[in-house]
UniProtKB/Swiss-Prot annotation:
InterPro entries: 4_helix_cytokine-like_core, IL-6-like
Family assignment from sequence similarity: Belongs to the IL-6 superfamily.
Gene Ontology terms describing biological process: acute-phase response; cell differentiation; glucose homeostasis; hepatocyte proliferation; interleukin-6-mediated signaling pathway; liver regeneration; positive regulation of receptor signaling pathway via STAT; regulation of glucagon secretion
A GO cellular-component term linked to this record: extracellular space
Cellular localization per UniProt: Secreted
Protein's name according to its UniProt entry: Interleukin-6
Tissue spec: Expressed in white muscle, skin, spleen, anterior intestine and stomach. Not expressed in brain, gill, head kidney, posterior intestine and adipose tissue.
GO terms, molecular function: cytokine activity; growth factor activity; interleukin-6 receptor binding
Gene: il6
Upper classification of the organism: Eukaryota, Metazoa, Chordata, Craniata, Vertebrata
């Protein structure tokens, strides 16, 4: 019996010595430091989900983006010349400063029915353009996402038939070239309107997130002994 105990304790001592000499292995599931240049930990970082309204505005703007190439290819003049054309009853712009998020959303919502009516003029003068129909396909979803983001949702009604007819009559001209330029200018102004609103809303959203992150920053307390 004593000899068996001696053998047991000798084996235990030898095993302990081997464990002290062996390099430490990470415990299964434990976090370890990555070697320099190893980016395997990046999959743990999740990207902030895109704002649904901003994402949809980008989709609509992607459709309108083709207008510049089409216009310059047809007329061989600079795209920004369209800003010089005066179009009555254009919706008010979305300013980048001194406007609350709610006011920006309301401004965007108010502009949609006006541009929907103006695009009928574009269809008449530029029947091959796909932009008016593509815009209408997304306009109802745009309204839903705008009102869903508002604190106090409001109802913006479409223009009445008499208002729409008056709007289109104000654009009419006997000059064919002028009518075509007016149609292209409407598309130019629509793009500018959506870009300004998207950028202003995105700026407000990032500012809101920045303030929320600062409010959640942990405070370290130091105690003196």
């Amino acid at each position: 019996m004593p000899s068996r105990l001696n053998v047991f304790w000798l084996c235990a001592a030898a095993l302990a010595a081997l464990l002290r000499c062996a390099p430490a292995a990470p415990v299964d599931g434990a976090f370890t430091d990555n070697p320099a240049g190893d980016t395997s930990g990046e999959e743990w970082e999740t990207e902030r989900p895109a704002d649904p309204l901003i994402a949809l505005l980008k989709v609509v703007l992607e459709v309108i983006k083709t207008h510049r190439q089409e216009f310059e290819a047809e007329f061989h003049i600079r795209y920004d010349v369209l800003a010089q054309y005066n179009i009555p009853s254009l919706p008010a712009d979305c300013p980048s400063t001194n406007f609350s998020m709610e006011a920006l959303l309301h401004r965007l919502l108010q502009g949609l029915p006006v541009y929907t009516a103006l695009l009928k003029y574009v269809e008449k003068e530029e029947p091959k353009s796909q932009i008016p129909s593509r815009f209408r396909q997304n306009s109802e979803l745009l309204k839903q996402r705008i009102t869903g983001k508002m604190r106090h949702a409001v109802q913006v009604t479409p223009l009445t038939s008499s208002q729409e007819q008056q709007l289109l009559r104000d654009l009419d001209s006997s000059d064919t070239f002028h009518r075509k330029m007016t149609a292209h200018s409407i598309l130019y102004q629509l793009r500018s309107f959506l870009v300004d609103c998207k950028n202003a809303i995105n700026k407000k959203e990032k500012l809101r997130e920045s303030r929320a992150n600062r409010a959640m920053t942990p405070v370290t307390l130091y105690y003196q002994s």
